[in-house]
UniProtKB/Swiss-Prot annotation:
Compartment(s) of residence: Virion
Domain of life per record: Viruses
Coiled-coil portions: none
Keywords: Capsid protein, T=219 icosahedral capsid protein, Virion
Gene transcribed to yield this protein: MCP
Keyword RNA-binding: no
Protein name in UniProt: Major capsid protein
A single GO molecular function term of this UniProt record: structural molecule activity
Annotated SUPFAM superfamilies: Group II dsDNA viruses VP
Any one cellular-component term (Gene Ontology): T=219 icosahedral capsid
Family matches, as InterPro entries: Capsid_N, MCP_C, MCP_C_sf, VP_dsDNA_II
Family: Belongs to the NCLDV major capsid protein family.
């Protein structure tokens, strides 16, 4: 008897629980037929010029039957040496595509349905973005060495139609920040689930609008005349405008029968919204944050950000901490500065900032990596000369690229936290590490950066299918109690607490109009 047949006849009472009355087979594929449809991404323009510090609106045209994934396309201007008679050292702050979004909202028939923030988009992607998608997403939102690492007048010129002899390899650091187009995926309910795509065909009497508030350029760009502690602000760099801005919407085209049903029948969608009650300023170690929330919420997410991390004015003042670290740190949610600066110079030695013997330059890139005669930035005071740099051009490039997602910053500002509902503890007091390590490990795709704290009422908060909520509409008094680290609020130091909540609501569409079933 063949061994496989012996296994087959070794059938007992316990096997009934596994293979009795079978419902599927692994040996004949089955599938389900779907309705016929087509999909096309169509560009939508804003009313008025989209630029730094402005609010613009895009009315979603009725090009298709449904509106699905929506991307913000923004082209950053070139920031180069021509903006000053002297040297220009400049960089876009981390994740420029997210940072330039102050807030973005979707409204139907004049009613705001949801509002989100660049800060929230960063936090959400820290929790949900898979490692496989990370590299592509970083490029989409501009978190690359070409944009977020400081440019240097001694580096290679930008390759373009007017510089036929320019270095074309992306690993060569440049003397300017190139004009670059970013693609920022919006995270509204209808963008993340095809079953929630917005039925434009059923909204004959209501317009759908996307309102976008763009941050001032001072909160997105860092540009000075020197990086040795004596630099001053490059005024002309902050006069630049966005080269272009628009939306790309994935339109869905339905077949005749489904199109008719979609247009004529009423619809109810269970949607997700974001609640944010604003920044709460704190200056002491023990704090009670009142949560003015409504609706069934599936998770709370909060950060505590020291004001010193985002002091944009201070970052342009010579010899201040943020000036030495090459700009403000808007996505640093820890109690200390990130001491790893966004600069090629940090990995190739301090002397690589200037002179013909830069660690990476246009002419010597990867040709003779050990020919550089620069000296190490760390010198023995008793030695006549310093040691040669041991980091090659290739090594410097690898270190710089690897460091894009590495940080030398502090710890979670939250030492302990506790949630109280109507004066009763929802859970016992927990250490901050429980909220930025254990909770994300249990409920999310990835572990976020330090300082992003989570408490989930749902088993699977990333999924649309409800798996647990807490109805804050039925809670009279909700309080988040936080004890913060000394480094966060020591002396006159202050910080901002931001609490976000993801809740469910119902969007009703009938008679050509749409609106929320439950208001605040």
């Amino acid at each position: 008897m063949a061994g496989g047949l012996m296994q087959l006849v070794a059938y007992g009472a316990q096997d009934v629980y596994l293979t009795g009355n079978p419902q599927i087979t692994f040996w004949k594929v089955t599938y389900r037929r779907h309705t016929n449809f087509a999909m096309e991404s169509i560009e939508q323009t804003f009313n008025g010029q989209a630029d730094f510090g402005r609010r613009v609106t895009c009315t979603i045209s009725r090009n298709g039957d449904l509106a699905y994934r929506t991307y913000l396309q923004i082209t950053l201007p070139e920031i180069g040496q021509s903006l000053s008679s002297g040297a220009v050292y400049a960089r876009w702050l981390d994740f420029p595509g997210e940072q330039l979004i102050s807030q973005v909202e979707v409204e139907i028939g004049g009613q705001r349905i949801d509002r989100q923030y660049g800060d929230w988009m960063h936090i959400w992607n820290q929790l949900t973005l898979s490692k496989e998608q990370e590299r592509g997403y970083f490029k989409m939102v501009g978190n690359t060495t070409q944009l977020t690492y400081v440019c240097d007048p001694n580096f290679a010129a930008i390759d373009g139609p007017c510089s036929a002899n320019g270095v074309r390899q992306v690993c060569a650091p440049r003397d300017a920040l190139p004009e670059t187009t970013l693609y920022v995926p919006l995270q509204f309910w209808y963008c993340r689930n095809p079953g929630l795509a917005l039925p434009l065909i059923a909204l004959q009497y209501h317009e759908v609008k996307i309102n976008l508030d763009i941050r001032n350029i001072e909160e997105c760009l860092w540009a000075v005349s020197a990086i040795d502690g004596t630099g001053t602000k490059i005024t002309d760099a902050y006069k630049q405008s966005l080269a272009a801005a628009s939306l790309f919407v994935d339109y869905i085209f339905l077949d005749t029968d489904e199109r008719r049903r979609m247009a004529q029948n009423p619809h109810e969608y269970l949607i997700e919204q974001l609640q944010f009650t604003g920044d709460e300023s704190v200056g002491s170690s023990s704090n009670k944050i009142k949560l003015n929330l409504n609706h069934p919420c599936k998770e709370l997410i909060w950060v505590v950000q020291p004001d010193a991390n985002v002091d944009y004015c201070s970052s342009l003042t010579a010899s201040t901490h943020l000036n030495n670290l090459l700009g403000a740190q808007p996505f640093n949610y820890t109690d200390a500065f990130d001491a790893l600066p966004n600069a090629v110079h940090a990995f190739g030695g301090q002397a690589s900032a200037s002179g013909a013997n830069a660690v990476i330059n246009a002419s010597g890139l990867f040709e003779d990596p050990f020919s550089n005669d620069i000296q190490s930035s760390v010198l023995d005071s008793g030695a006549a000369t310093g040691a040669d740099s041991g980091v090659s051009d290739a090594g410097t490039f690898v270190l710089a690229e690897t460091a894009l997602d590495m940080h030398c910053w502090g710890e979670n500002p939250v030492i302990v936290a506790k949630l109280q509902l109507n004066g009763q503890d929802r859970f016992s007091e927990r250490e901050g590490t429980y909220f930025d390590l254990v909770q994300p490990y249990q409920h999310h795709t990835r572990a976020p950066d330090s300082g992003i704290n989570v408490y989930s009422f749902a088993l699977h908060p990333e999924e649309h299918q409800p798996s647990g909520t807490c109805n804050f509409s039925r809670i009279d008094n909700a309080t988040l109690q936080l004890v913060l680290s000394n480094a966060t609020v020591q002396g006159v130091n202050t910080a901002k607490v931001r609490v976000y909540a993801v809740n469910y609501n119902v969007l009703r569409i009938m008679s050509g109009m749409g609106g929320l079933a439950y208001s605040n």
